[in-house]
Curated annotation (Swiss-Prot):
GO molecular function, one term: lyase activity
Keywords on record: Cytolysis, Dermonecrotic toxin, Disulfide bond, Hemolysis, Lipid degradation, Lipid metabolism, Lyase, Magnesium, Metal-binding, Secreted, Toxin
Protein name according to UniProt: Dermonecrotic toxin SpeSicTox-betaIIA2iv
Principal subcellular localization: secreted
Active site: H5, H41
Cofactor(s) recorded in Swiss-Prot or TrEMBL: Mg(2+)
Top-rank taxon: Eukaryota
Organism for this UniProt entry: Sicarius peruensis (Six-eyed sand spider)
Family the entry assigns: Belongs to the arthropod phospholipase D family. Class II subfamily.
UniProt-annotated location(s): Secreted
Disulfide bridge map: C45-C51, C47-C190
Coiled-coil residues: none
Keyword Magnesium: yes
Length: 275
C-alpha cells in the first residue's frame, strides 16, 4: 500500500493517485464537542508541505465516495484504502466517544450511503493515542444501532502515536478487538527515526497466532534510501509525500519480484504469507 500523506484538499485526491498512491491519508479536525468539521492538518506539518489545505469533511467524503464507486464518472480503481487521521489529541478525551458517533454517522450518510451505492474502499481509523480508545467503541456502537454492522468488514484500527506495543494490545483486548488491526510506526518527515520499534511491530505481526497486528507501515518517508530500508524489513505499506518515489523504488530489481501494488482484491486485514 502506497499511502499518500496529508491529502486534505479535494483537488489533491486525484493528484496523489496520479503520482501512484493506491491509498490516501487525510486529517479529520474536530470542534470542541467532537464534531468532525474539516479535513485539515494545520501548523506545524511536514517539511516542504503546505499545512493549511482543507475541505469540509462531509464534502470530502462525498468526493472520495465518487472516486471509489465503480460506474461513477470519477471512479479510480486504484484507490482502495482511506486512512482517516483522527486529530483526537486536539480535543478532550471525554469527547472521544462523541467523535466516534459523529464520524461513523457521517461515513454512513456521505460515504456508504447506508447501502445505496456507496464507496467501496477500505477504511482505516488512525487513532493518535490509546487514551482515545472510546472512539472505537462509539464507532462500532453507532454502526450497530443504525443497523449497518456489515460495514465493520470494511473498517480497520490503527494507533499511530508510537506508543508501547503491549499497551496497545491491552487496549485492543479491553475493546474486544483482535482483527483488522494495522500498526503504524514513524515520525514527521523533518526528523530521522530509527527502526527499533518498527522491527518489534514486524516481529509481532510475524508471530504465529498473534492477532493484534495484521499489517505494518512506516511513515512519513520521503528519502528513497529510507523507503528501501523499510521495504527490506518487510513492511506492508509506506506513507509518503511523494508516492512516485515509492513507485520508482518498487521497480528496482531488489524489490520488483518481492512487492507489488495492492489492488481491491487484496484483503488489508489478512496477514500476508509469502508463497
Amino acid at each position: 500500500w502506497i499511502m499518500g500523506h496529508m491529502v486534505n484538499a479535494i483537488e489533491q485526491v486525484d493528484e496523489f493517485l496520479d503520482l501512484g498512491a493506491n491509498a490516501i491519508e487525510f486529517d479529520v479536525d474536530f470542534d470542541d464537542d467532537g464534531v468532525a468539521k474539516y479535513t485539515h492538518h494545520g501548523m506545524p506539518c511536514d517539511c516542504g508541505r503546505s499545512c493549511t489545505k482543507y475541505a469540509v469533511f462531509t464534502e470530502y467524503l462525498d468526493y472520495v465516495r465518487q472516486v471509489t464507486t465503480p460506474g461513477d464518472p470519477k471512479f479510480r480503481k486504484e484507490l482502495v484504502l482511506l486512512a482517516l487521521d483522527l486529530k483526537l489529541q486536539r480535543i478532550s478525551s471525554e469527547k472521544a466517544y462523541a467523535a466516534g458517533v459523529d464520524v461513523a454517522t457521517k461515513l454512513l450518510d456521505h460515504y456508504w450511503m447506508r447501502g445505496w451505492n456507496g464507496g467501496r474502499a477500505y477504511i482505516l481509523l488512525n487513532i493518535p493515542l490509546v487514551e482515545d480508545y472510546e472512539f472505537i467503541r462509539a464507532f462500532k456502537d453507532t454502526l450497530r444501532k443504525e443497523g449497518h454492522e456489515q460495514y465493520n468488514a470494511k473498517v480497520g484500527i490503527n494507533f499511530t502515536g508510537n506508543e508501547d506495543l503491549d499497551e496497545i494490545r491491552e487496549v485492543l483486548e479491553k475493546l474486544g478487538e483482535d482483527e483488522h488491526i494495522w500498526q503504524a510506526d514513524g515520525i514527521t518527515s523533518c526528523f530521522p527515526r530509527g527502526t527499533e520499534r518498527l522491527k518489534k511491530a514486524l516481529e509481532k505481526r510475524d508471530t504465529p497466532g498473534y492477532k493484534y497486528i495484521s499489517k505494518v507501515y512506516a511513515w512519513t518517508l520521503v528519502r528513497s534510501s529510507i523507503m528501501r530500508r523499510s521495504l527490506r524489513l518487510g513492511v506492508d505499506g509506506v506513507m509518503s509525500n511523494y508516492p512516485d518515489r515509492v513507485v520508482k523504488v518498487l521497480k528496482e530489481k531488489e524489490f520488483s519480484d518481492k512487492f507489488r501494488l495492492a489492488t481491491y482484491a487484496d484483503n488489508p486485514w489478512e496477514k500476508f504469507t509469502p508463497i
